[in-house]
Every structure is written in structure tokens, then in C-alpha cells.
Amino acid sequence: MKSLLVILSILLISGLCARATTEQEKTFVEKYKTALETNDTTTLQSCLYTTGADPMIVGFYKMMQSNGEGDKVSKIELEELTLDDVKKATAPQDGPSGKVCLNLKPTKKLVIVTEKKDENGSSTNTTENFIAEKDGKFVIPVPGPCK
């Protein structure tokens, strides 16, 4: 009987933890989507994890975030990393001041599809950002010098 109670307790706790993570993901995605659509640069930039990051790359990330501000977000979701994503995330990349690496290990990727319509027609754009967790919060890690 005691072992049955222990097993049920473990299942209940792990179910609650999974639900909390799902709620955390939904909250992050909604916050990011709202910030994109309302040109909220402060919120967008608060999602960047810049500790140890290359300052030129931080500037580039900020510019890229503001590049699509105000566009209609037609799809935004956190996805699991594929094997190719993991390989790409862990490999050193060429940066403005040498080889750079992500300063946090990504756990997911944020996929954003935006639509833009104007007098010249319409277009869609898809962007992907690696997402990591730091202090219980989802962040976009900005690359810095490899260690």
C-alpha cells in the first residue's frame, strides 16, 4: 500500500511539474508575440541573455528583434531541438572578433512566422532563435567568445 502511495505521489508531482513548464512556455510565447506586435523593444530586449556576449552581436540581435516589430505574427511556438539544432547550437561560429559560442545550453527553439502586407504586396518571414533557461526564465542566449 505504501509503495502505491509513493508511486501515485511521484506521478502527481511530475504531472504538476510538466504542467508548470507548459504554462511557463505559453506565457513566454505570448509575451514575446505581444512585444513583437506592439513594438515593445524593452520587453524584447529583456528576453536576451547577454552575460558574456560579444557587444557587436548583442547590437545585431537587438537590431534583428526590432526589424520585424509591428508585423503580424501568424505563428509563434517553442519547438523541441532536432539533432541538427543541437549540433548547430554547440558548434563554434565565426563572429566579428573570432569564434563565438552560445553562453547557455539551448533547450528549445522559438519559431516565428510573420506576415507583412503593404502597397507592394505581402511577404512572410520565418525566424528561429535558440531558447535556454536561466534562473527559471526562458531567454535567448546571445553568443560570446568560446571558452
Predicted segments — roles?
Residues 16-38, 46:
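Short, low-complexity N-terminal intrinsically disordered segments enriched in polar/charged residues
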Residues 40-58:
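Short, well-ordered alpha-helical segments enriched in acidic and aromatic residues
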Residues 116-147:
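Short beta-strand edge/turn micro-motifs at domain boundaries
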Residues 4-14:
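Sec-dependent N-terminal signal peptides
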Residues 62-124:
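Surface-exposed, charged secondary-structure patches
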Residues 48-51, 80-82, 116, 144-146:
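A mature extracytoplasmic/lumenal domain signature
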Residues 36, 100-103, 130-132:
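Short, exposed beta-strand/loop patches in secreted or surface proteins that constitute
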